[in-house]
Amino acid sequence: MGLPVSWAPPALWVLGCCALLLSLWALCTACRRPEDAVAPRKRARRQRARLQGSATAAEASLLRRTHLCSLSKSDTRLHELHRGPRSSRALRPASMDLLRPHWLEVSRDITGPQAAPSAFPHQELPRALPAAAATAGCAGLEATYSNVGLAALPGVSLAASPVVAEYARVQKRKGTHRSPQEPQQGKTEVTPAAQVDVLYSRVCKPKRRDPGPTTDPLDPKGQGAILALAGDLAYQTLPLRALDVDSGPLENVYESIRELGDPAGRSSTCGAGTPPASSCPSLGRGWRPLPASLP
């Protein structure tokens, strides 16, 4: 006969499976306990990440809109400062009406330039200053922008404020010590300003003095003729009347030739007539006798 084989009843198999399931469940619960303690922190981080992602998406959508690029009322808080009563019709600042929805609708519907003022019903436009106020402000000589105020008005020209040319002419002041030519300069200063430029181009020569009816020792006849040198270049005798000069005798500035050429008294040997050049050495070879008659 063989060995007897023991067969376990099915109830034991069922109990073993239940024990295995319970052990697995216990193991899973033990592993989840530390995760439950860290769960609030993870949840807070996840919520922050979600909020940041939604904020960036909202900002990107706002930046894409061109009509919302400027500051809004919530940022400036002007609507709270200048609110006023509801029934009042007082004008509000133009910055409060930039983002109103009716302004956008009206600006889209109306494209003509004539209807542009109607798109800003509550905006204060700058007004031009009256003529009296502008002229009163520009009356001062030390006004910085006086000409700008006059040019802005159509009826007033820039000629209303005369401009003085400070550097147009040179003004001379009289000094304490006066030279002999200063009396003549005083006469020229009396002339009008239009001839100032002409005065500087001319040379003021002093007038010749009239000593009297004395005659020149070189010209005993007093005809007013000038002797010309008889050298290589032939000059003609020119009368003084043809040169627009006074007919009176010239001032004796230089010493006579006889005094320089005859210091020892040889002038007595040379007669007053027309001696030859060899008999009168004081005259030299370059002189010729005076003509008998002058035209």
From Swiss-Prot:
Residue numbers spanned by region Interaction with LCK, PLCG2 and PIK3R1: 254-257
What does the UniProt entry list as the effect of changing residue 145 to F?
A: No change in binding to LCK, CSK or FYN
Q: Where is this region: Interaction with LCK and PIK3R1?
A: 235-238
Q: Cite the record's Polar residues compositional bias ranges.
A: 266-281
Cell compartments where the protein resides = Cell membrane
Q: What is its main location?
A: membrane
- Residues that the record marks as modified (Phosphotyrosine) are 145, 167, 200, 235, 254
Q: Which GO terms describe its cellular component?
A: B cell receptor complex; extracellular space
Q: Where is this region: Interaction with GRB2?
A: 145-148
Membrane found in the keyword field: yes
A GO BP annotation? regulation of phosphatidylinositol 3-kinase/protein kinase B signal transduction
Q: Where are the transmembrane segments?
A: 7-27
Q: How is it modified after translation?
A: Palmitoylation of Cys-28 and Cys-31 is required for raft targeting. Phosphorylated on tyrosines upon TCR activation and/or CD4 coreceptor stimulation, or upon BCR stimulation; which leads to the recruitment of SH2-containing proteins.
Q: Assembly and partners?
A: When phosphorylated in response to BCR activation, interacts with LYN, PIK3R1, PLCG2, and GRB2. When phosphorylated in response to TCR stimulation and/or CD4 co-stimulation, interacts with LCK, CSK, FYN, PTPN11/SHP2, GRB2, PIK3R1 and GRAP2.
Q: What is this protein called?
A: Lck-interacting transmembrane adapter 1
Q: Can you name the source organism?
A: Homo sapiens (Human)
